């Protein structure tokens, strides 16, 4: 079973979408320079656009790695000003350790251009329809493990 950690960032109007993405990049990279930071910075415009559209309000940005999964939500409007539900604390593990990936929630009508734009900069950063959840490896394995021999079933 995968451990999941959640963080919630204050966005607009507390900080703009670019500043919100910068804060998320700082959390995920723990302030360290490297390939992960470069790839996350390369998609700043696209990620900020999704944050400005309030995509991560109810559907999280999800970072996966060889360790725990990190879900990142954003607060907007009065919730962002108030900040009571915010949790921007540093993580107690390296959120992009080993084989990492980041999935950004995206409105369905923007999915095509967003996926195309992200692909130009990174194969590790993808977009998904914000109305769809994130499949875990256990779910994928379970789906593949179930198969029905229809011929054998009908003969019995």
Curated annotation (Swiss-Prot):
What keywords are assigned to this protein? Antiviral defense
What's any GO biological process attached to this entry? Answer: defense response to virus
Organism superkingdom: Bacteria
**Record's function text:** CBASS (cyclic oligonucleotide-based antiphage signaling system) provides immunity against bacteriophage. The CD-NTase protein synthesizes cyclic nucleotides in response to infection; these serve as specific second messenger signals. The signals activate a diverse range of effectors, leading to bacterial cell death and thus abortive phage infection. A type III-C(AAA) CBASS system.
Q: Which family does it belong to?
A: Belongs to the bacterial HORMA family. HORMA3 subfamily.
Q: What is known of its domains?
A: Does not seem to be able to assume a closed conformation, does not bind closure peptide. In the Cap7:Cap8 complex only Cap7 binds a closure peptide.
Q: How does it assemble?
A: Interacts with Cap7 (also called HORMA2) and CdnC; forms CdnD:Cap7:Cap8 (also called CdnD:HORMA2:HORMA3) complexes with stoichiometries of 1:1:1 and 2:1:1.
What is the official name of this protein in its record? CD-NTase-associated protein 8
- From which organism does this entry originate? Pseudomonas aeruginosa
Gene designation per UniProt: cap8
């Amino acid at each position: 079973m995968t451990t999941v950690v959640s963080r919630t960032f204050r966005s607009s109007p507390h900080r703009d979408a670019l500043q919100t993405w910068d804060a998320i990049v700082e959390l995920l990279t723990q302030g360290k320079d490297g390939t992960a930071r470069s790839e996350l910075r390369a998609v700043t415009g696209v990620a900020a656009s999704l944050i400005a559209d309030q995509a991560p309000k109810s559907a999280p940005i999800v970072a996966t790695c060889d360790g725990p999964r990190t879900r990142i939500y954003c607060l907007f409007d009065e919730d962002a000003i108030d900040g009571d539900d915010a949790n921007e604390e540093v993580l107690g593990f390296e959120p992009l350790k080993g084989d990492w990936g980041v999935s950004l929630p995206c409105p369905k009508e923007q999915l095509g251009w967003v996926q195309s734009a992200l692909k130009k900069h990174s194969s590790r950063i993808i977009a998904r329809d914000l109305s769809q959840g994130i499949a875990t490896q256990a779910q994928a394995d379970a789906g593949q493990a179930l198969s029905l021999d229809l011929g054998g079933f009908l003969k019995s």
